């Protein structure tokens, strides 16, 4: 079971959906920055852009690492933080190609569809 996290820039909210591994299989080979049709995730009319993710073992995806697996690389800054001058660190990161071992995939909405993502909530007090 994999999770996609969809960020909505207009409202500032994020939405989480659980998807099957066969849907991740359809996305295999896509890269960070690719646009995907929302019909993969029961969101017709929406266009989504892949912005990142993480593998089953927790390693984050790195945009400028063009491989499908994980790799230990030597970098001058840690992923997501600014480092100190002169210090290099060896870290394990996952490449930017989506594979079957993805557990979380982060996306943003680039084109909106006819139906809103947020479902109206029922009030408990009134019947």
UniProtKB/Swiss-Prot annotation:
Q: Which UniProt keywords apply?
A: Ribonucleoprotein, Ribosomal protein
Instruction: Enumerate the InterPro entries for this protein.
Output: Ribosomal_eS6, Ribosomal_eS6_arc
Q: Name one GO biological process term.
A: translation
Q: Name one GO molecular function term.
A: structural constituent of ribosome
Q: Which domain of life is it from?
A: Archaea
Q: Name one GO cellular component term.
A: ribosome
Identify its protein family.
Belongs to the eukaryotic ribosomal protein eS6 family.
Q: Which PANTHER family match?
A: 40S RIBOSOMAL PROTEIN S6 (PTHR11502)
* NCBIfam families, per database record: PRK04290.1-3
Q: What is this protein called?
A: Small ribosomal subunit protein eS6
* Record organism: Picrophilus torridus (strain ATCC 700027 / DSM 9790 / JCM 10055 / NBRC 100828 / KAW 2/3)
Q: What is the lineage of its organism?
A: Archaea, Methanobacteriati, Thermoplasmatota, Thermoplasmata, Thermoplasmatales
Q: Which gene encodes it?
A: rps6e
């Amino acid at each position: 079971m994999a999770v996609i996290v969809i960020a909505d820039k207009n409202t500032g909210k994020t939405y989480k959906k659980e998807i099957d591994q066969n849907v991740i299989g359809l996305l295999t080979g896509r890269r960070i920055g690719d646009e995907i049709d929302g019909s993969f995730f029961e969101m017709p009319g929406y266009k989504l852009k892949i912005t990142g993710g993480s593998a089953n073992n927790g390693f984050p995806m790195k945009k400028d690492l063009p491989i499908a697996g994980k790799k230990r690389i030597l970098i001058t800054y840690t992923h997501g933080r600014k480092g100190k001058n002169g210090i290099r660190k060896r870290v394990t990161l996952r490449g930017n190609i989506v594979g079957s071992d993805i557990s979380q995939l982060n996306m943003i909405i680039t084109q909106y569809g006819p139906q809103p993502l947020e479902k109206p909530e029922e009030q408990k007090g009134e019947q």
